[in-house]
């Protein structure tokens, strides 16, 4: 199982939100580059970065910081948030990003998604964020009438190989992942799944590993030290 430490960028800082609410933010580190270096030092193999400002604005607003992170670490970096054009995708790759995560565009611009997947194949990940089972977009501010299962099936047909699934109600809560929704997703698609939201303990990670989930994104639990990064990397290596 892959472990992805999370760095969420807002106004140039590393923050965590509670249940996706932008008004409920906690600054975890004023220097996201330093945080990336810390994660790498403790053994992270890949970093997961979300441009929260970009998710709302519809364009990357933290590109200079993302570029600095890519230059500061030797491990791959995957980035999501506000990426809604081929130019934006190409910019991220040009500054050293390894994989790009598309969210809102996956729901509203299938032509762009199909073209991007055709060009970059496994380098394109789709992020599906759900609220009560329905897909949320534009920085989680809008909730659609499309179920997360239906969107995942559409993504699989297009050729998307990896999906990041986030249950917004769990994000930043340390309440444990939404195992039921993940199990239902597994039954409906064969894509690789990365779980995000609510992971609070080594036991949560072991449960996801037992389900054969491809990867897990861990944010608040690392910052609040309910999960030790070195320990969880060792545990998943042995599983």
Swiss-Prot record:
One Pfam family of this chain: His_biosynth
EC code: 5.3.1.16
Catalytic residues, chain numbering: 8 (proton acceptor), 129 (proton donor)
Pathway assigned to this chain's UniProt record: Amino-acid biosynthesis; L-histidine biosynthesis; L-histidine from 5-phospho-alpha-D-ribose 1-diphosphate: step 4/9
GO biological process: L-histidine biosynthetic process; L-tryptophan biosynthetic process
Coiled-coil ranges from the UniProt annotation: none
Domain of life, source organism: Bacteria
Catalytic activity field: 1-(5-phospho-beta-D-ribosyl)-5-[(5-phospho-beta-D-ribosylamino)methylideneamino]imidazole-4-carboxamide = 5-[(5-phospho-1-deoxy-D-ribulos-1-ylimino)methylamino]-1-(5-phospho-beta-D-ribosyl)imidazole-4-carboxamide
Main location: cytoplasm
Protein localization: Cytoplasm
Gene Ontology molecular-function annotations: 1-(5-phosphoribosyl)-5-[(5-phosphoribosylamino)methylideneamino]imidazole-4-carboxamide isomerase activity
Keywords: Amino-acid biosynthesis, Cytoplasm, Histidine biosynthesis, Isomerase
Entry GO CC: cytoplasm
Keyword Cytoplasm: yes
Family affiliation: Belongs to the HisA/HisF family.
Protein's name in the database: 1-(5-phosphoribosyl)-5-[(5-phosphoribosylamino)methylideneamino] imidazole-4-carboxamide isomerase
Protein source organism: Bacillus cereus (strain ZK / E33L)
UniProt lineage: Bacteria, Bacillati, Bacillota, Bacilli, Bacillales
Gene name for this UniProt entry: hisA
